[in-house]
Amino acid sequence: MYTVGIITISDKGAAGQREDKSGPKIKELLPKDKYDVVSYKIIPDERKQIADELVRLCDDVKCNLVLTTGGTGFSPRDITPEATMDIAERNAPGIAEALRAYSMSLTPKAMLGRGASVIRKNTLIVNLPGSVKAVSESMDFLMGNIEHGLDILLGYDSECGGKLK
């Protein structure tokens, strides 16, 4: 069972001016037999606050996976990728690149996404878009593809290639 933290990053959501639908959608789409959501929080687009919450989930709660939603666009307040990179120990760019490539097959506007994917300690962090539709599409793609990486990160598996006979 993988432990998961979900962070919705939205000024309006944090202020109670907008209902968060993307964070709950992430939780809904996580297979219940494999993923246990241990934290869900809505925070504003504040770089330090985002970084602090990521550190808490990685270092204190020790989540295996942290999924963020929101703050990945071009708005001056969209700083989720920067806050994520601030606390990263290792980059895992293939995940964000693959998500963008998949999303590009659905809409050319996906090229405007700036989400990052990184590792801190034994936690994989993936920035997802903010819209419910984009979150749903991203989760469909992501869930079938990251478990092997999580297993390696957590020490459950050490082989990426086939074994010699």
Regions found by a protein language model. Give the residues of each.
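Non-catalytic beta/alpha edge segments that cap or flank active sites
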Residues: 1-165
